């Protein structure tokens, strides 16, 4: 019997996606990454078919003995590499993690301070997203465009005047660390809590190239497990013994999560172990690559944000492309050449420019995991120039991109090349390519 046409279509689309994004494109989306083959193999396990509500050893379902083991082990590993005391892996995304924290810290009508939207605040921090859904007022802290950061003195004054229930630091356009130490004591002085959204920089924190906000005064930290931390898509919440964490942990189930997608757990554990042994070298290479790419783009005539500050201290690079037609046009043009980035608001844009902002946001973390280094960042900058400035035929540039990727198809910073793993491997679990 031949396969139904519908099934053939599903398999064709899946294969096309895997071939395209795994072997033919420069993946420079700042919020994405790639798991190791080992992490992917344990991701595709029986856990994906199972349910487990509640906390380990206190479940509402039977048949969870191995779920309890893997969840407990994964939390221990995550606390170890994060240098934290508390971890909850049940949020299924960073936004769900934020929602649980925000709901505990404030009631409808209460106030929260955030960074401006156009300066990098994630949509979940705003009235357009999770805060709005919870009925919490968002007030934007003053922002220093020259230093691409929260204006500390003005923010302190606002904290003292507004007396919010909580303050959120961290963001989705995040070139430089927010002033956690500088604001923490002032936040606490008015009885508020400091929430740090480390979704984008969690892997950098673990790699010890970004200051740990829990050690700098943050009460609680939310993360994604699939950006600079190269694990499965999901979220987590950490604290260093905060009472807030206990309250939040009680609300995740049943308010925000029922079953928490158990197949994430072994893949997250594998990634945590990879980061334990390879995280520092990976994070350091990410920073070298982002700096190299920013400098190479600037040398070729692009307006790279943050020149006076060294361009970036994270995995991200931000480029103003207004003179070439704006972020929307240029992101699409680059995609035609198999270079994948996203359009992004820049600090001096208006919130209403979100559909066609001035900028591009570029992230180097995924191509770094494929083994690219500073030399390849020079090549990538040259490809940007060919597409955007030189206006070369995008199909010709696409050929160059595909040729470049042929040398960077294997995930690095992992144990996958060790023969000891062969007894655990299963060819049936490999991606369809």
From Swiss-Prot:
Cofactors (names): pyridoxal 5'-phosphate
Top enzyme category: transferase
Disulphide-bridged cysteine pairs: none
Name of the protein this chain belongs to: Serine hydroxymethyltransferase
GO molecular function terms noted in the UniProt entry: glycine hydroxymethyltransferase activity; pyridoxal phosphate binding
Catalytic activity: 5,10-methylenetetrahydrosulfopterin + glycine + H2O = tetrahydrosulfopterin + L-serine
EC numbers on record: 2.1.2.-
Means of activity regulation: Is completely inhibited by addition of NaCNBH(3) in vitro; this reagent is a known inhibitor of PLP enzymes, that reduces the internal aldimine of PLP to the catalytically inactive and stable secondary amine. Is also inhibited by L-cysteine, which forms a thiazolidine complex with the active site PLP.
Keywords noted in UniProt: Amino-acid biosynthesis, Cytoplasm, One-carbon metabolism, Pyridoxal phosphate, Transferase
One GO process term, biological-process aspect: glycine biosynthetic process from serine
One cellular component (GO) term of this entry: cytoplasm
CDD domains: SHMT (cd00378)
Statement: the UniProt record of this protein carries the keyword Cell wall biogenesis/degradation: no
Assembly and interaction partners: Homodimer.
PROSITE patterns per record: SHMT (PS00096)
Subcellular location: Cytoplasm
InterPro entries: PyrdxlP-dep_Trfase, PyrdxlP-dep_Trfase_major, PyrdxlP-dep_Trfase_small, Ser_HO-MeTrfase, Ser_HO-MeTrfase-like, Ser_HO-MeTrfase_PLP_BS, SHMT-like_dom
Residues that bind (6S)-5,6,7,8-tetrahydrofolate: 121-123, 243
